[in-house]
UniProtKB/Swiss-Prot annotation:
Matching InterPro entries: Myo-inos-1-P_Synthase (IPR002587), Myo-inos-1-P_Synthase_GAPDH (IPR013021), NAD(P)-bd_dom_sf (IPR036291)
GO terms classed as biological process: inositol biosynthetic process; phospholipid biosynthetic process
Protein name: Inositol-3-phosphate synthase 1
Keyword Phosphoprotein (UniProt): yes
Binding locations of NAD(+): 67-70, 141, 177-178, 188, 191, 228-231, 278-279, 303, 306, 337-339, 352, 390-391, 419-420
GO MF: inositol-3-phosphate synthase activity
Region (Disordered): 527-557
Gene encoding the protein: ISYNA1
Catalytic activity: D-glucose 6-phosphate = 1D-myo-inositol 3-phosphate
Entry's family note: Belongs to the myo-inositol 1-phosphate synthase family.
Domain of life according to the entry: Eukaryota
Length: 557
């Protein structure tokens, strides 16, 4: 069925006003206790009131690494869609779209219509969201190339599209950025001709001035800052240096070790702007997280989940969920863009290796039948730099699992990932969903004071390889669980129950739900002794496309 564009929930629990959507929602879950070796499961229920502001702001996005492949590609994508561009290719004419974006190209099911068919709507229609074509971009880069030149250097887009975008992008020039050579590979020094001078404290203040200038000059209501620059080496968490907000701010003032990405995170938080980390390093050290908590500013990370790791988070979930014991995961990549060149240095590769390797942890821990405590699959990650392949990353994976009675199963997968074309829609979703979360507040029957989501915005886990979560919160990596989390929270905001995929209406011998349509019965089917009527629920008796001579007779009690 073709996706509709808008809907209204007709329920006494949902109230629409010009300013807000207010929904009463019953959150049902379970708590588990252990008593004498027996697990006691206790169903619980909490009454939530969600309130979502309907007024969509004028939103600006500042990209750290704006002139890189990801930044130039995202900017080009929004411009191409805004201008409704099309261009010729060897396989025919292509038109601008937002394929790869959960919010712009995904759909959700609202339920069944009168004929028992599912009704789907665009994901973006669940709640009022900023239109991506309306986004305003700015940012920083250690390279001084304008965005048109950066787009050409990236070699991601077809030439015909580049030619049309050139006059719209050549006036866009990144602001100077922070360059600390020891945090990125030495091979990046050739690009570093556009840097902020001075001490760490002076650099922090310059970033803050840049954010304020962008907000004022572009007439923006909100700004979100997103790190899409080089992968940095890990920063050691040291008591007295970066373990608390106070210590981190003092470290910056004293000019001690702090990474460029952490400087941008601190500046964003101090300016009240959400900060999202799209690279694998530990940008959000404990001091930065504490500062975000103190200022009630959203932060999220780490590392865009775009290609090989997204497939891994599905495939391992499938294998373990099917009862197969995955024992070996070997992942090999080669790519030729600047990300690959930077990752050719061991300290930067180590950051990426950590984020890629942790993606299966929650799936392994979810099955104590297969894995004993502390047991993990062997997991090897290799990344090589091959300049010729450019942004077209090759990913090869081998998954080996144990079967029953000593058997083994091996899956080998080759995946060609257009790196920036996969990352750009993720960056778009991060900005749109983060802004939406800023307009949602809620209270509960036991805590009537309005509150927002936790500053560590774990709802964004679907979009990150190594998702951050609040202290003590479980980390979820399984892709479909992550997507369901986003969808069901947005459904709750309009008073809809979570999507459970049960479809009980279609699994009953005698449907008790009244429907209108050609397959509906005119009167309820009565339960009597003896054989049940043939196909009382409208079943045709067809199985896998093959008609049956006679529908099965179901016994009754």
């Amino acid at each position: 069925m073709e996706a509709a564009t808008e809907f209204v929930v007709e329920s006494p629990d949902v109230v629409y006003s010009p300013e807000t959507i207010e929904a009463q929602y019953e959150y049902r879950t379970t708590s588990v206790s252990r008593e004498g070796g027996v697990l006691k499961v206790h169903p619980t229920s909490t009454r939530f009131t969600f309130r979502t502001a309907r007024q969509v702001p004028r939103l600006g996005v500042m990209l750290v690494g704006w002139g890189g492949n990801n930044g130039s590609t995202l900017t080009a994508a929004v411009l191409a869609n805004r201008l409704r561009l099309s261009w010729p290719t060897r396989t025919g004419r292509k038109e601008a779209n937002y394929y790869g974006s959960l919010t712009q190209a995904g759909t959700v099911s609202l339920g069944l219509d009168a004929e028992g068919k599912e009704v789907f709507v665009p994901f973006s229609s669940l709640l009022p969201m900023v239109a991506p074509d309306d986004l305003v971009f700015d940012g920083w880069d250690i390279s001084s190339l304008n965005l048109a030149e950066a787009m050409r250097r990236a070699q991601v887009l077809d030439w015909g599209l580049q030619e049309q975008l050139w006059p719209h992008m050549e006036a866009m020039r990144p602001r100077p950025s922070v360059y600390i050579p020891e945090f990125i590979a030495a091979n990046q020094s050739a690009r570093a001709d556009n840097v902020i001078p001075g001490t760490r404290a002076q650099q922090l203040e310059q970033i803050r001035r840049d954010i304020r200038d962008f907000r004022f000059s572009a007439g923006l209501d909100k700004v979100i800052v997103l790190w899409t620059a080089n992968t940095e080496r890990f920063c050691e968490v040291i008591p007295g240096l970066n373990d608390t907000a106070e210590n981190l701010l003092r470290t910056i003032q004293l000019g001690l070790e702090v990474s460029p990405s952490t400087l941008f995170a601190v500046a964003s938080i101090l300016e009240g702007c959400a900060f999202l980390n799209g690279s694998p390093q530990n940008t959000l050290v404990p001091g930065a997280l504490e500062l975000a908590w103190q200022r009630r500013v959203f932060v999220g990370g780490d590392d865009f989940k775009s290609g090989q790791t997204k497939v891994k988070s599905v495939l391992v979930d499938f294998l373990i969920g099917s009862g197969l014991k995955t024992m070996s995961i070997v992942s090999y990549n080669h790519l030729g863009n600047n990300d690959g060149q930077n990752l050719s240095a061991p300290p930067q590769f180590r950051s990426k290796e950590v984020s890629k390797s942790s993606v299966v942890d929650d799936m392994v821990h979810s099955n104590p039948v297969l894995y004993s405590p502390g047991e993990q699959p062997d997991h090897c990650v290799v990344i090589k730099y091959v300049p010729y392949v450019g942004d077209s990353k090759r990913a090869l994976d081998e998954y080996t699992s144990e079967l029953m009675l000593g058997g083994t199963n091996t899956l080998v997968l080759h995946n060609t990932c257009e790196d920036s074309l996969l990352a750009a829609p993720i960056m778009l979703d991060l900005a749109l969903l983060t802004e939406l979360c800023q307009r949602v507040s809620f209270c509960t029957d036991v805590d009537p004071d309005p509150q927002s989501f936790h500053p560590v915005l774990s709802l964004l886990g679907f979009l990150f390889k190594a998702p951050l979560a609040p202290p003590g919160s479980p980390v979820v990596n399984a892709l479909f669980r992550q997507r369901s989390c986003i969808e069901n929270i947005l459904r709750a905001c309009v008073g809809l129950p979570p999507q459970n995929h049960m479809l009980l209406e279609h699994k009953m011998e005698r449907p008790g739900l009244k429907r209108v349509g050609p397959l509906a019965t005119t009167s309820p089917v009565l339960c009597k002794k003896g054989s049940a009527p043939t196909a009382p629920n409208g079943c045709t008796g067809d199985a896998n496309g093959h008609s049956q001579a006679e529908a099965p007779q179901m016994p009754t009690t």
